Amino acid sequence: MRIWCLVWCLVIAVVSQSVVAQAGDAWLQFQGDALRSGNAAAAEVPSRLGLVGAVPLSDGIYTSPAVADGKVYAVDGSGVVWAIDAATLNVQWKFATRGGAGNCNNVSSPAIVGKYLHLGTMAGFYYVLDRHTGALVREIDCREAIFSSPAAGADRVYFATVGAQVYAVEPDGTVAWTWDFVKEVIGFDGDRWSGEAWLQARPDRVTWRDHFVCSRELCLIGKTLVIPAGGRTVFLDDAGSSAKLRVAGEIPAYDGKEFPATFGQSADSAGNVYVQWHRRDNAGRVEILKLNGDAVATDFVKGTQTAIHLPGLLSFASVSIRGDDVYRVRPEQGLGLCRHSAGQEQPQVLCPAPSICPPVIAREHVLYGGLDGKLYVVPLAEGEAQSLATAFEAPITAPVAVADGRIYVPSEDGYLYVFGEHGKAPLPTRDLNVKQARSPLAGRFSAAKFDWYTNYGNFGCTNANEQELRPPLRMRWVRRLEGTVKHLPVCGGGRLYTHTAEGQIIACEQDTGRLLWRRHFPDVYLSFTSPLYVNGKLLVPQAGIKQSRMRCLDAETGKLLWEAPFTGSPSWSRQFPPVVHGNIAIYASGSGTYAPQGTEKPFTFKGTPQESADGKEVMSWIYSNDNPYYPRDNRPLLWAWDLNTGKIVWEKDFSEYGRGGNDCGICIMDGKLYYSTFFGYSASHRARRGLPPENNGLTACIEPETGKVVWQSTKHYVTAKCTLTGRDGRLYIGGYNQANELSKDRFVWCLNAKDGSLIWQSDPITSALNAVSVGDRFIFSNALRGRGNVFDRETGKVVGGVDHNYACCRFTMSEPYILGANMDMIDLSAGSKLVSTGPAIDSRECLGAVVSNGRIFYTSQASGFIVSQTYGEDALNLPAVWNR
């Protein structure tokens, strides 16, 4: 017994040394310590940095390396572990973790614990390896993906699964205890990944109260583990043989009270926990939480607060802390790296380059990777920042490691770059082609005709398809997202495309979710717009207050082919990308002057209007849903570009009929372009302001080749927050506002596409948002905090509805079902019965799921998460990689 105790004490001593040895000779875990502070005060950066070499791995790298005893340990996206000699950069050994093609997008960074190397994988296995030989010491089957990196303490290591199951393990991987957030805090004991199980346990749909995902990093403060789970900050003590819950801390109410998403979490040695959170629509800040007994005291870092009406974008990374200073990155040009100092209301900009990569604070510099693929070395004192390029401009999204005067930089191009003093190595020239798909989409619906290739499914904007959707639903894959989104998933070429409101364009495999490529363009500002996949190209309207560009990319590689300017604000509801006819891409927008906050109440969404310096009308970039009129300089515009070159083919300006243009819709049907726009419901206000009073809106049929108007009507038109839908020779028009100031009623209108004449007007409804979904059997529209409606195809009578009180959810239809927030599935053929709900991965309910190519895809609007599900027979045959 005495010998065992001596041995165990020796192990503890070794482990303790390994954890605190954060001098310049080692980098033992993510962000340098279990606090995730990023504070490496002992690490020196050479004055003359250059590339020492670049080590090719087997996939993109989304993890941070660990360094000790002259070896570098890295994990690539495919879960391959690499041990590299720091002096020669030769590979000493490598270890392929289990899971095959589905074991991708690995983000759990390795940790060195004495003679062991710890890491988790997307396949749901946790590994302990002998770090000297690569031999497997222990494999723990957690049966859930692991996003968090191991947090190594004095005598134990901690990690959590994405489903918020927490593990404490000994250095050799022996499990000391487990703790389950879903069971202990939410009180749910079923299959957390099953929508049917949640429905059995709940009388209604899941909401933000059921949110449970743990997708970001843990912190360890002494013996207290801090876990970002389900929008809460959980303080959990290691009580020896078990865990003891101290408190599940909550972010204070600000722009709502829902449990928000955590996009980054770190702590300092004083016990302060810094949480970068997001609740909705750019609203968030860095909250400071600290245990006070079994309660939590809160404050926030001044100058980090963002909102829909305030200037500045969210951050999507943890902050780094030294003393009273907080260092924070953002994906915003001009505000890339900022220092927030105690007592200062506004931050100091240290480097303008945008980033989603947590910074590392060395002795005299801050180090971070940019979305432009460069390493930035920024002096803490005066002086110019140094930028060091990588070979292929691929983003650097995982933090660097610093040891022995070298900087180890993981890149999404698949290379581990090593920078050091007097480095003179050339950049690599061999493209590792991580952008090539490795798991092609297969199955009965894999053909291109089954693609959901644009925001509303097709150029008719029917928002509907039929691909034999039926229960049961089963998870296929999950992946993390560092951004916010308001468009529906878009698919084509076996790839899923995402455009974040902050300017990232991302492509991943539909089958596995594996990241293929990521591009970021500066000056994109809250652009809630969707990509379009067409003919191997990707068209993305990227809007911003400073500039707006239509960008055409090669869909396979992300290479920019052309870009063209446009004007106006997409605001909340103009998610749609261009429509394409032949070789012409056509887009609709407005014009005008914009700022985060407008000059009049009808031009703002919230807050006090702000007068402009020159007295001119200014529209909020994200403006009110209630639209009696629009500013004088808002013109309704149409743009037509050559799809191959981006050259203008024709333009159209309808401002002689009214002012507006941002709240509009377009679709293609039977070789014709249909356009509808809103000028505001109040003719009397427009007359008093000297604006054209005659028309509240306009709908037109146009020749797409030339822009020639075939017919136009000012009798029926969209009333904002809705596009128009074309199918079977009919147009369907909805919206949020009343059509005129004499009535509060809203309707869906069905028009004859030949001449614009009215076929039917629906029963009065609360509103009709986003798009009127028109399938073979059903016509449906959602309402904002009201009843969603099912309409009779021939009369417009309301014949059914959905009463689950959704907000602005962008439902889609895959008959006979509609798909809503958190993958809710409602059967319209069974009286709008809810047949599946959840899992609750999103704290908001702005987006629905889509069915494309026989799979379900869902992007959380607020919580930084993308998932795919299978259904029917495929649910039995194509499980998630962790589902065994």
Language-model regions: role of each:
Residues 5-17:
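Bacterial N-terminal signal peptides
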Residues 51-55, 90-99, 135-140, 175-179, ...:
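A short beta-strand motif characteristic of beta-propeller blades
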Residues 85-89, 130-134, 170-174, 237-241, ...:
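Short loop/turn segments that connect beta-strands within beta-propeller blades
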Residues 19-21:
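Sec/Tat signal peptide C-region and signal peptidase I cleavage site
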Residues 24-34, 58-82, 95-127, 139-167, ...:
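Repeat-blade elements of multi-bladed beta-propeller folds
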Residues 23-51, 190, 441-475:
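Blade/loop signatures of beta-propeller domains
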Residues 427-442, 446-448:
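Non-catalytic propeptide/linker segments at domain boundaries
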